């Protein structure tokens, strides 16, 4: 939705670090968030004007900026916004140079500046990358299978777990739908696939999903964080997945303590007789119950 958001995105240069910052104060649920782009090289030029970067009728395959010695330094409001940095590096024959570009988003300006500072420099970036490698080696190595079919081994030993965690749990994305919502049924299914690799994530998803149950027992079929807007529907198989996921978790880990965790209920109007569903932001009920009681209800 670049065209609809472009008029409200304001860009600036952070005076302390020189990083480029961008925010959209009209994004109701994310108005405090600040995106940033930084580089380990201090000698750089930049622009936050997409028209300048690409050129009129230009493309990402052949942007106009590649023909320019420097970018203008244009920032502010009223642009077709982007974050672009240009760094010139001269290399002698056989010489190499490491550059680090950091691109991310903070919860607010203070958080963005903290992240910029944390990942400044090649050393910090290498340490972060080593941490990422260690995490994935540990997580993807939790389960190992060997079958007569090499292609199945390739999928099962790493790739499917990676896809489930990165795409389904973190990105809430799929081949046919990339909406970013939590699905009551879908993410419980996904989290169960991680019971051996990331059991804490399954436990967290059980408690999170229980908190999206209405007092009457039905649930939000899907919802968007952080506010929790979503749909209340007549879909009936949602009822099955919370007790099934709890049974899978307790059976695999013998952690019966999850049954005593407490989660709130939601309050909202019932689905009308002539409706299949409706989209709304429900209220948080003052009533809470244990995970076991949520499963029973």
Region spans (language model):
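Beta-strand-rich interaction surfaces with strong enrichment in secreted/lumenal proteins
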Residues: 72-76, 86-91
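Solvent-exposed loop and edge beta-strand segments that line ligand/cofactor-binding
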Residues: 173-187, 227-237
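Aromatic-rich carbohydrate-recognition surfaces in CAZymes
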Residues: 194-202, 206-297
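Low-complexity, Ser/Thr/Pro/Gly-enriched N-terminal "stalk/linker" regions
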Residues: 130-177, 204, 208
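Short Pro-Gly-centered flexible turn/kink motifs
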Residues: 89-107
């Amino acid at each position: 939705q670049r065209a609809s958001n472009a008029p409200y995105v304001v860009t600036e240069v952070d005076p302390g670090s020189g990083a480029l910052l961008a925010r959209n104060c009209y994004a109701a649920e994310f108005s405090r968030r600040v995106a940033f782009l930084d580089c380990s090289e201090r000698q750089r030029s930049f622009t936050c004007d997409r028209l300048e970067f690409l050129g009129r009728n230009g493309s990402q395959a052949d942007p106009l900026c590649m023909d320019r010695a420097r970018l203008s330094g244009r920032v502010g409001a009223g642009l077709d916004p982007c974050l672009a940095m240009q760094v010139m590096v001269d290399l002698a024959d056989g010489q190499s140079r490491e550059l680090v570009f950091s691109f991310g988003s903070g919860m607010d300006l203070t958080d963005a500046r903290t992240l910029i500072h944390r990942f400044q420099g090649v050393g910090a970036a290498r340490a972060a990358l080593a941490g990422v490698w260690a995490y994935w080696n540990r997580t993807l190595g939790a389960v190992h299978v060997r079958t007569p079919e090499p292609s199945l081994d390739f999928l099962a030993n790493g790739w499917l777990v990676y896809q489930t965690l990165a795409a389904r749990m973190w990105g809430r994305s799929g081949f046919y739908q990339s909406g970013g919502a939590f699905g009551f049924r879908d993410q419980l299914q996904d989290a169960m696939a991680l019971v051996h690799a990331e059991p804490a994530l399954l436990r967290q998803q059980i408690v999170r999903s229980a908190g999206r149950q209405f007092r009457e027992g039905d649930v939000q079929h899907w919802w968007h964080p952080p506010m929790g807007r979503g749909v209340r529907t007549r879909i009936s198989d949602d009822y099955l997945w919370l007790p099934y996921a709890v049974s899978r978790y307790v059976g695999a880990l013998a952690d019966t303590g999850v049954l005593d965790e407490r989660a709130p209920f939601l309050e909202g109007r019932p689905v009308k007789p002539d409706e299949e569903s409706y989209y709304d932001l429900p209220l948080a009920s003052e009533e809470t119950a244990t995970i076991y009681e949520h499963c029973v209800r």
